[in-house]
Each structure stands twice: as C-alpha cells, then as structure tokens.
Amino acid sequence: MLNKLELLLTKAGIELSLQQKQQLVAYVDMLNKWNKAYNLTSVREPEQMLVRHIMDSIVVSPYLQGHRFIDVGTGPGLPGIPLAIVRPDSHFTLLDSLGKRVRFLRQVQHELDLVNIEPVQSRVEAYSSEPPFDGVISRAFASLKDMVSWCSHLPEPIHGRFYALKGVLPEEELTILPFGISIDSVIKLNVPELEGQRHLVILKSN
C-alpha cells in the first residue's frame, strides 16, 4: 500500500517524509480494521481509502492559513488526521458527537503518536474554544449556510476562515450565505484517480 500512496503523491506533486507516508498507511490500516466492527466509512477497500480519504484530504493542505484548526463532524478523522500528519506544526481539534468515532480517534492518536490532534466528543453548537481557531474545516458535514450558522462562534473574528470540502461546486449554496459572510475563494482540487469533481470553498466574515 505504501507504493500505491507514493504513486498518488507523485501524481499530485506532494512531497512527504517516509515517516509521514508510513503514518498515513498505518491510519488506513486502522480505519480498515475498525471499519469492520464500527462501520466508520462506506469505503471498504484500503486502496480506495488512499484515494477517497487520504488524498482527498491532504490536497487541501496548501490552502490552509494559520496553525489552529477544528475539523467539525470529523467522523473517523477526515480530513483532520491526514492533515495533522502532513502539517505537524499545526494543531487540529477533531470534533464529533458519536462516542465510537471519538474512541477510534483516540486510538489512532495513541498508536500513531499524534501530538497535534485533540479528539473531542461534542455537538458543534455546544463546543467553545478560547482562543478561537484560525480555521473551521468540514467535509461532507452540512450545507455552507448551516456550517457557518452552527460554527459561527469558532473562528477568529477577523482572520479566521471556514474551509468547506465539496464535490460539485454548490453554486446555489453560494448565493444564500448568511449575512456578514462572503466568499474568500473557490479552488478546484486535483485528486489523482478520483472520479468526479472536488472543490474547496473558503469563506470569511465581512
């Protein structure tokens, strides 16, 4: 599986250390193992996890601004854990309301010795942080409007950003953003061997 990952990274133009590659593969191994009992993802094949989970997450890394991030509705740690592996100098709070997912995240944290993640079991509207985050990240979590509404208390008011990983560009969602929120940028992502479109929508407060 390491060879497959290296091929995908080369296609994407991403350079990682051997340790980072090994951590990503170990994470996929754990996800595949736990998935049989906990049903953490609908993706069943480890090599497909490399494409649809690992690569789909880490291609976002160059566009993140800051060092403190929260991944809301992280599920089994996506995109937070892959991003934490490729950005060891950043810190990621991984938020999910389901206990079984958070238990998995804590096991990953322990086995991979990830010191820059903090798994938290909570609903997003009930969670608060001081200081606020540089970025709020979501992948398949909610509509842009709901994401911003539910998470408005989390980012730093001036420089904080909302990062929403989307498939096909949600043009209708972009027209009904809450008052005081505007589009910072929309980036078309290149994920090797992934069918369909991928976009990163970055939102900011006015």
Curated annotation (Swiss-Prot):
Domain of life: Bacteria
Catalysed reaction equations from the record: guanosine(527) in 16S rRNA + S-adenosyl-L-methionine = N(7)-methylguanosine(527) in 16S rRNA + S-adenosyl-L-homocysteine
Residues noted as binding S-adenosyl-L-methionine in the record, renumbered to the chain: 73, 78, 124-125, 139
EC number(s) per entry: 2.1.1.170
Similarity section: Belongs to the methyltransferase superfamily. RNA methyltransferase RsmG family.
Protein name in UniProt: Ribosomal RNA small subunit methyltransferase G
Keywords from the UniProt entry: Cytoplasm, Methyltransferase, rRNA processing, S-adenosyl-L-methionine, Transferase
Organism for this UniProt entry: Photorhabdus laumondii subsp. laumondii (strain DSM 15139 / CIP 105565 / TT01) (Photorhabdus luminescens subsp. laumondii)
GO CC field: cytosol
Organism ancestry: Bacteria, Pseudomonadati, Pseudomonadota, Gammaproteobacteria, Enterobacterales
GO MF annotations, alphabetized: rRNA (guanine-N7-)-methyltransferase activity
Annotated S-S bridges: none
Primary site of residence: cytoplasm
CDD domains xref list: AdoMet_MTases (cd02440)
Listed Pfam families: GidB
Role: Specifically methylates the N7 position of guanine in position 527 of 16S rRNA.
Locations listed in the record: Cytoplasm
